[in-house]
């Protein structure tokens, strides 16, 4: 990918309040993530999410995060909220992801929780398998493995990411204003995803942290474009 024209996309995930969404939009977020997993502290009910999504301006994507949800549940959420992109973050198989996405006709990203023994070859195979299975596959989201679902708040070994898929991945896992510049400069991902790194409490965002995070990403973009 030509870094001279690349702008790292930014997703702020786990929003539950209108004021936090407006802060994220004002700071320049490209996508807003809503967690439809009832056991998450960042869970938002579909009717509440629908009210927030109705306030989104053009060209900002609403992403719905699901964990082991069945097709009927996803269909109901899509019908109620009009989310534009699905994010599968549980133990869904390749076939299940493809089938659910097809049932609602929405593109999807697949979260891969990277373990200490995950290899670069594993990541390449994941991408190949999902891309072969569905025309709606939009890319991998790489997060850190923890013994629970949803955001980890922890960083994994970025050196595992193969250079040839890095420009297509969404980088997640423990990102914050303190490491976002380094992450983008080293990995050059298509997008970054942050939740706990811009919070003052689970599900409650901090406007100063949002602004600092997005500024840190833009510092990296500017540095890459100057090379």
From Swiss-Prot:
Pathway recorded for this protein: Amino-acid biosynthesis; L-tryptophan biosynthesis; L-tryptophan from chorismate: step 3/5
SUPFAM superfamilies: Ribulose-phoshate binding barrel
Keyword Amino-acid biosynthesis tagged: yes
Pfam families the record matches: PRAI
Highest taxon of source: Bacteria
Gene3D superfamilies: Aldolase class I (3.20.20.70)
Family indicated by similarity: Belongs to the TrpF family.
Protein name as catalogued: N-(5'-phosphoribosyl)anthranilate isomerase
Organism: Herminiimonas arsenicoxydans
Lineage: Bacteria, Pseudomonadati, Pseudomonadota, Betaproteobacteria, Burkholderiales
């Amino acid at each position: 990918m030509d870094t001279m024209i690349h702008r790292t996309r930014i997703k702020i995930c786990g929003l539950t309040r209108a004021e936090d969404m407006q802060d994220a939009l004002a700071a320049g977020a490209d996508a807003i993530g809503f967690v439809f997993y009832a056991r998450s502290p960042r869970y938002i009910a579909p009717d509440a999410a629908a009210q927030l999504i109705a306030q989104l301006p053009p060209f900002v994507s609403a992403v719905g995060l699901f964990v082991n949800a069945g097709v009927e549940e996803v269909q109901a959420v899509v019908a109620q909220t009009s989310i534009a992109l699905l994010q599968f973050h549980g133990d869904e198989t390749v076939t299940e992801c493809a089938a659910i996405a097809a049932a609602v006709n929405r593109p999807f990203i697949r979260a891969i929780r990277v373990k200490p023994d995950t290899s670069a070859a594993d990541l390449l195979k994941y991408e190949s398998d999902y891309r072969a299975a569905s025309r709606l596959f939009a890319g991998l989201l790489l997060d850190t493995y923890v013994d629970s679902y949803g955001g980890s708040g922890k960083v994994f070994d970025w050196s595992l990411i193969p250079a040839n898929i890095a420009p297509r991945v969404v980088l997640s896992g423990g990102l914050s204003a303190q490491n976002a510049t380094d992450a983008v400069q080293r990995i050059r991902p298509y997008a970054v995803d942050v939740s706990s790194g811009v919070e003052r409490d689970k599900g409650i965002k901090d406007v100063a942290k949002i602004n600092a995070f997005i500024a840190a990403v833009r510092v990296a973009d500017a540095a890459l474009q100057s090379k």
